[in-house]
């Protein structure tokens, strides 16, 4: 609910179409689920749309598509809805619409290549919300395994190349991750450190309905050190002990730490210390086709293009357009 969402960075309820869905094409999945409920509904897999079809009046009435098996399709209907996601895996579109992030790795579905957005542009639409600040979630450094909510499953702190605490990883987590990644003073080197009690929780975490984070131990990316001093020495983190001491002092005092983090976890180091080398990774784009509140794709005169709709990450973020920031994906679009 909204009350709990605020601790992750949500600042207002979003009830508008166009809010992005996390970068993985969820809007397309939702649409496919609805289509297959109809007796004559049919989903054609491994098939890419190549272009839209317009009639003499300029209305979008269908599209051409080509399957991986060589089959060609011409489909017509009353309207077309673009729901193919963002463009985080398209280097050229990143350079054009999010140049500040063009050189970074995006940890997202490989299908996020922006074809739907380009089709909308070719049909007369335009892109809005370019080059806004993008969020990032935590991943393991080696395998890029998603660790977005490890701070809930296994309370700990995140440190940089010197062992300095990077900040409040609870409040506004995804933007804290993004800022840490962009800050060159951090040396683009990060570790998530936690104690044995948190390690037990991490091995048996059911945050996603299955025990996913145990992979960090199975892959050998979670490493145990006999002491803080040993971890500091082997990982070359000279300030690690001081960062843990400051965190623990705040935990014992029951007060926020210097970064404003409340309820700091006490890191018990008598049984040694666990560390995972981690990497904040960007994972979606927020620029996209301009739409109205009925999900019509708009032309540059802000008029609806007849027969053309859009939903999900293929759209520009209406929440950003309204001067809000990304709400961690909990505000799924009404589209």
Question: Which sequence ranges carry the predicted segments?
Answer:
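Glycine-rich phosphate/pyrophosphate-binding beta-alpha loops
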Residues: 135-140, 174-177, 281-286, 314-331
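Hydrophobic alpha-helical segments, especially N-terminal targeting/anchoring helices
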Residues: 54, 66, 159-160, 291, ...
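Glycine-rich loop(s) and the adjacent beta-strand/alpha-helix scaffold that form part
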Residues: 68-139, 295, 330
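Rossmann-like flavin
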Residues: 1-8, 224-230, 234-242, 246
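A glycine-rich dinucleotide-binding beta-alpha-beta segment and adjacent secondary-structure elements
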Residues: 51, 239-318, 322
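Short, small/polar residue-rich loop motifs at catalytic or cofactor-binding pockets
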Residues: 109, 151-153, 283-285
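An anion/pyrophosphate-binding glycine-rich loop and adjacent beta-alpha core
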Residues: 113, 117-119, 126-235
């Amino acid at each position: 609910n909204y009350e709990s969402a605020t601790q992750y960075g949500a600042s207002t309820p979003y009830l508008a179409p166009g809010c992005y869905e996390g970068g993985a094409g969820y809007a397309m999945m939702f649409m496919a689920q609805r289509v297959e409920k109809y007796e004559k509904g049919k989903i054609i897999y491994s098939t890419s749309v190549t272009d839209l079809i317009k009639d003499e009046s300029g209305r979008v009435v269908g599209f051409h598509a080509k399957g991986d098996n060589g089959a060609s399709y011409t489909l017509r209907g009353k309207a077309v809805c673009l729901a193919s996601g963002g463009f985080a895996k398209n280097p050229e579109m990143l350079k054009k619409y999010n140049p500040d992030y063009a050189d970074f790795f995006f940890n997202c579905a490989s299908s996020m290549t922006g074809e739907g957005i380009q089709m909308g542009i070719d049909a007369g639409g335009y892109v809005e919300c370019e080059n806004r600040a993008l969020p990032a979630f935590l991943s393991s450094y080696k395998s890029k395994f998603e660790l977005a909510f490890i701070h809930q499953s296994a309370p700990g702190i995140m440190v940089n190349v010197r062992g300095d605490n990077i900040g409040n990883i609870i409040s506004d987590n995804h933007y804290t991750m993004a800022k840490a990644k962009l800050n060159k003073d951090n040396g683009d080197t990060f570790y998530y450190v936690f104690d044995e009690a948190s390690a037990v929780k991490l091995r048996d975490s059911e945050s996603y309905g299955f025990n996913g984070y145990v992979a960090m131990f199975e892959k050998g990316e979670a490493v145990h050190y006999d002491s803080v001093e040993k971890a500091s020495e082997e990982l070359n983190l000279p300030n690690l002990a001081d960062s843990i001491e400051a965190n623990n002092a705040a935990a014992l005092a029951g007060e926020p730490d210097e970064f404003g983090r409340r309820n700091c976890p006490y890191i018990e180091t008598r049984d040694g210390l666990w560390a995972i080398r981690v990497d904040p990774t960007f994972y979606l784009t927020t620029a996209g086709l301009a739409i109205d509140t009925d999900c019509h794709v708009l032309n540059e005169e802000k008029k609806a293009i007849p027969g053309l709709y859009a939903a999900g990450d293929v759209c520009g973020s209406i929440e950003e357009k309204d001067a809000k920031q990304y709400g961690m994906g909990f505000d799924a679009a009404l589209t």
